[in-house]
Amino acid sequence: MFNSFGNIFRLTSFGESHGPGVGGVIDGFPAGIKIDMDFVQQELNRRRPGQSLLTTSRKEPDTVEFLSGIFEGKSTGCPIGFVVWNKNQHSNDYENIKNLFRPSHADYTYMQKYGIRDYRGGGRSSARETISRVVAGALAKLALKQLGISVTAYTSQVGPVKLDKDYKSYNLDLIETNDVRCPDPEKAKEMAELIWKIKGEGDTIGGVVSCVIKGCPIGLGQPVFGKLHAALGNAMLSINAVKGFSYGQGFDSMELKGSEQNDVFYNNNGRVETKSNYSGGIQGGISNGQDIYFRVAFKPVATILMEQHTVNINGTDTTMKAKGRHDACVLPRAVPIVEAMAAMTILDYYLIDRTTQL
């Protein structure tokens, strides 16, 4: 299995949903960065289960314990090891389905590939693995902050309820004022009501997380196989339940003519800028200094509390009904995960760019 992400800034994660804990080892993190432990924990709290009535009721403190690489509050340049211990596993919730393949889960593919699987909460395929990403992403954010780079994500769509304007039209400071993490209070209320309704039916629903990266310098990314948008796409598509990635105008640009879609350059007091940003801040695979923005599509959570047809490990047709504690919609908790993967990617490519010229 490929359990590492990144080139210079590199995370190797470990752990399963119902094992003793999850964690990681970070290589390539610059020395001398002040580590704000409260901020790191705050980022984990944004991802933590049980934070609202809209999320899974699994209660986990998700307190991170750093094992190495930090001394007197600063990074040392050595590998940073960390772990978050699992405290609230209910493995018995999975006894009734341990010999069944849950529809649209990784159960069947894991069994076929490895000949063995951890059926308790999906094991390694569980979104609980993303804890390690959020910790690494929090550290990446701290480094990027020193460079004047910020990463902000928000829920822009839940099912049919979606925002009809781009990020510039909203006050992004409102994202954390509601459980859905949407910058539009009225739309957030509609989204929450829809999630609550779907949850009451024992079903699930998907949506879209949008993300904007501000302050990114010109020149990040490679022209052929290391395009920045490809790296961001790879990062986002590695997140559980993600089904699509679109940057800039994405598929909407297909409806425009070149004369409408081109980002025209102009001189803004000695600085070259573009009058529009249909490219999403990336041209030729390289950042152009404008805001980078993209959208990430999440499918409905596969575990539903309704009877479904499936097969058992012997291939016999049967039915199953899941039980336990599950999210009806991953979007609110996915926001910090999207931010984390984006921050890790940008920091990695910033460090790569420093090797371009002597």
Curated annotation (Swiss-Prot):
The keyword Flavoprotein applies. It comes from the Bacteria. NADP(+) binds at residue 47. CDD domains: Chorismate_synthase. Reduced FMN (FMNH(2)). GO terms for biological process: amino acid biosynthetic process; aromatic amino acid family biosynthetic process; chorismate biosynthetic process. Its EC number is 4.2.3.5. Its cofactor is FMNH2. It is an enzyme of class 4 (lyase). It catalyses: 5-O-(1-carboxyvinyl)-3-phosphoshikimate = chorismate + phosphate. FMN binds at residues 124-126, 240-241, 284, 299-303, 325. Pfam families: Chorismate_synt. The keyword Lyase applies. Keywords: Amino-acid biosynthesis, Aromatic amino acid biosynthesis, FAD, Flavoprotein, FMN, Lyase, NADP. Coiled coil: none annotated. GO terms for cellular component: cytosol. SUPFAM superfamilies: Chorismate synthase, AroC. Pathway: Metabolic intermediate biosynthesis; chorismate biosynthesis; chorismate from D-erythrose 4-phosphate and phosphoenolpyruvate: step 7/7. GO terms for molecular function: chorismate synthase activity; FMN binding. This reaction introduces a second double bond into the aromatic ring system. Belongs to the chorismate synthase family. Homotetramer. This is Chorismate synthase. It comes from Phocaeicola vulgatus (strain ATCC 8482 / DSM 1447 / JCM 5826 / CCUG 4940 / NBRC 14291 / NCTC 11154). The gene is aroC.
